[in-house]
Amino acid sequence: MIVVQTLFIHIYQIQFVITRRYRIVNQTILNRVKTRVMHQLVSSLIYENIVVYKASYQDGVGHFTIEGHDSEYRFTAEKTHSFDRIRITSPIERVVGDEADTTTDYTQLLREVVFTFPKNDEKLEQFIVELLQTELKDTQSMQYRESNPPATPETFNDYEFYAMEGHQYHPSYKSRLGFTLSDNLKFGPDFVPNVKLQWLAIDKDKVETTVSRNVVVNEMLRQQVGDKTYEHFVQQIEASGKHVNDVEMIPVHPWQFEHVIQVDLAEERLNGTVLWLGESDELYHPQQSIRTMSPIDTTKYYLKVPISITNTSTKRVLAPHTIENAAQITDWLKQIQQQDMYLKDELKTVFLGEVLGQSYLNTQLSPYKQTQVYGALGVIWRENIYHMLIDEEDAIPFNALYASDKDGVPFIENWIKQYGSEAWTKQFLAVAIRPMIHMLYYHGIAFESHAQNMMLIHENGWPTRIALKDFHDGVRFKREHLSEAASHLTLKPMPEAHKKVNSNSFIETDDERLVRDFLHDAFFFINIAEIILFIEKQYGIDEELQWQWVKGIIEAYQEAFPELNNYQHFDLFEPTIQVEKLTTRRLLSDSELRIHHVTNPLGVGGINDATTISET
């Protein structure tokens, strides 16, 4: 009970700070952010059957009433054809007796509404902190953008740093717990800061390293930081009495260095097992994931480094076993591609290889300290998209495909005008979907291909192929359904302790539904559905028609490859599929999978007889 009371005090303190700060922010921006947080929250509460509610439909419009203690909340919403997703279409009213007032007070709503499961006050208050921090940081971001409007994007990096709307379903889409507003300004991707990395030299026996074929670590390191910095680092190492071949040089995010390394590894720095080398000169911008650093010099590698913060409800550290799997999975995927002429020569899919992974693993530390630094120090080196583009090609992140410029004009507007909305959309869907279903059906591999993990490669706006990234914890398979080319992979097992804190993070499973729905959830439910809804809103192409095009692309693939056994194991046309309950995960323990069944727009039935099945 004491913990809960402390959390209440913490919340009120945050609210006081917010109230004071809001006196100087643009009220229009503030209202827009509060409304977005409120709408995404309420949509997810209904969608995941978290709250007790009533719904009735008149002329296709849903009238919803959420039950509260001594109050109720009313609004209208539509149920889309895309997995029954809820889109709120009116202001939300709080009703007490005969009085009704429009509200965006999501903290009051969460404390008043009746849940469908026993309410955990501590988890609830922690979730409220995430929502408040999302409101703070998105308001800060939008106000900064208004005062410093970015130029119209032209290159991949421009789009990467411009499209900063965040998750369109998750209500705490920009929480960044652990960052102050000052930290957010210095390290948040919304502000396109120039960031320099700190570097450590660590005794090799304290580091687990995984290296892709044909990679020479020190040569790659020298190319990344430059000859002058590399030689300076070597001198530092030798001055400490060590040899460069006896240590590993690992980059550290400056926030992580200040808040974690300097504190939790102070003893190791003092006894010399961890040596601080200093700062390198090359500049990086943080990508939308925050922990992936994008070099301004596009000849260099992306560096994914842990930051001990929480964003969209996920810890942004790097679990050691996933780092240690990075290069193996990269070599596995690229070997599959070399043996698959359709994937290599027709689809020409790009896999941005994670060619080097290093994680700090000191078994001599006490169990307590090992827990403290778990996943807090390590790096994954990833190939740069610019290394892969040829001739007239350019690339754009998938999340930028449903984003707009400062005047509200979609980034894809000129392409739609040039090629026509129907022709462009059909081409885009074919280019995006065929590689994903080929890897699933032919090789038995599903990818967690949400918008941050996919890039569209195009020639003058015409979609030609895709690039994929983030494989170290973003693929899933059932071994008996792998193709011969894919059957030879040895993985570092997930520690039992990691399963207890994140039961959703695994690569291999015995449940084939969890393979199929891994693709359905990230790719179709979050990624493609968002683009389809955007196309309908902006260009008037009916949502249901677009899903028929998607279904046609899958059926055409099956006709071209009729012999594949995996069609019976990974049926993308089943009436319902399982998707993750993202908000429920914040309100209950994360020790088990939180999933529910939703209507599949590719399956039989459809919107007219769709119901979301409640699973608590």
Swiss-Prot record:
Coiled coil: none annotated. Pathway: Siderophore biosynthesis. Induction: Up-regulated under iron-deficient growth conditions. Repressed by Fur under iron-rich growth conditions. Pfam families: FhuF, IucA_IucC. InterPro entries: Aerobactin_biosyn_IucA/IucC_N (IPR007310), IucA/IucC-like_C (IPR022770), IucA/IucC-like_synthase (IPR053631), LucA/IucC-like (IPR037455). Keywords: ATP-binding, Ligase, Nucleotide-binding. Its EC number is 6.3.2.55. Signal peptide: none annotated. GO terms for biological process: siderophore biosynthetic process. It catalyses: 2-[(2-aminoethylcarbamoyl)methyl]-2-hydroxybutanedioate + (S)-2,3-diaminopropanoate + ATP = 2-[(L-alanin-3-ylcarbamoyl)methyl]-3-(2-aminoethylcarbamoyl)-2-hydroxypropanoate + AMP + diphosphate. Forms a mixture of monomer and dimer in solution. Belongs to the IucA/IucC family. This is 2-[(L-alanin-3-ylcarbamoyl)methyl]-3-(2-aminoethylcarbamoyl)-2-hydroxypropanoate synthase. The lineage of its organism: Bacteria, Bacillati, Bacillota, Bacilli, Bacillales.
